[in-house]
């Protein structure tokens, strides 16, 4: 097993989680809905193409790209319709990613603070965390691309989270499932672990400074080593 996370976690004071595809299992839902809605307005996309283009990107970027490629005008409520479709689909089968609760219990035991910093809106993040029963664990520790002027892959969101919780960037550990998220962590000067337990191919996360893990509980093993 890669020993780099073990060494880095000795100095970690804050773990920053992405939400979709790391804490909650939404990355199999969102791309299918985006593909359907983009196709409806004249830009045919598959879920796999959506993942490659938009994984980890803020919703504002998604909207601008669909608007630029659509053959019919997007109504002002397009993004709201997308959010509602994702919310309804996730509500029908809310799931955390495997190992999430065990890892959070482990971090609580070690008294190691954690937060979530996601490209989704506050409404979407809080709905996902509420549906999966995680919301109380992240009270006052939810950060959204809505909070900053530039979303991932810019470092702004991660730096905002670290600053808000009083942690120097070098002592944060980012857990991400998207190339854009890993790019944002690197730009922020934060160590990053790539998580490939969802649909993300490990190869696209290979630039994560601390390697790629297929299971969140591997962080427990490396942290305890």
Region locations from a protein language model:
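Conserved phosphate-coupling serine/threonine residues in phosphotransfer and NTP-handling enzymes
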Residues: 22, 118-120
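Asp-based, Mg2+/Mn2+-dependent phosphohydrolase catalytic module
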Residues: 1-13, 105, 121-225
């Amino acid at each position: 097993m890669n020993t780099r996370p073990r060494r880095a976690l000795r100095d970690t004071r804050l773990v920053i989680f992405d939400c979709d595809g790391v804490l909650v299992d939404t990355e199999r839902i969102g791309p299918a809905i985006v593909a359907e809605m983009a196709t409806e307005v004249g830009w045919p996309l598959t879920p796999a193409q959506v993942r490659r283009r938009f994984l980890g990107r803020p919703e504002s970027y998604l909207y601008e790209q669909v608007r630029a490629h659509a053959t019919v005008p997007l109504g002002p409520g397009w993004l709201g319709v997308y959010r509602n479709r994702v919310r309804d689909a996730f509500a029908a089968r809310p799931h955390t990613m495997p190992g999430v609760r065990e890892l959070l219990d482990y971090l609580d035991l070690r008294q190691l603070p954690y937060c979530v910093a996601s490209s989704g809106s506050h409404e979407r993040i809080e709905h996902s965390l509420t549906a999966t029963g995680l919301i109380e664990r992240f009270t006052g520790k939810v950060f959204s691309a809505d909070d900053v002027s530039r979303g991932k892959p810019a470092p702004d969101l991660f730096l905002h989270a670290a600053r808000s919780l009083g942690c120097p960037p070098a002592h944060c550990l980012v857990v991400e499932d998207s190339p854009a998220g890993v790019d944002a962590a690197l730009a922020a000067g934060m160590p990053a672990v790539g998580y490939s337990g969802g649909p993300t191919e490990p190869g696209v996360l290979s630039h994560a400074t601390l390697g790629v893990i297929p299971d969140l509980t591997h962080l427990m093993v490396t942290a305890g080593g």
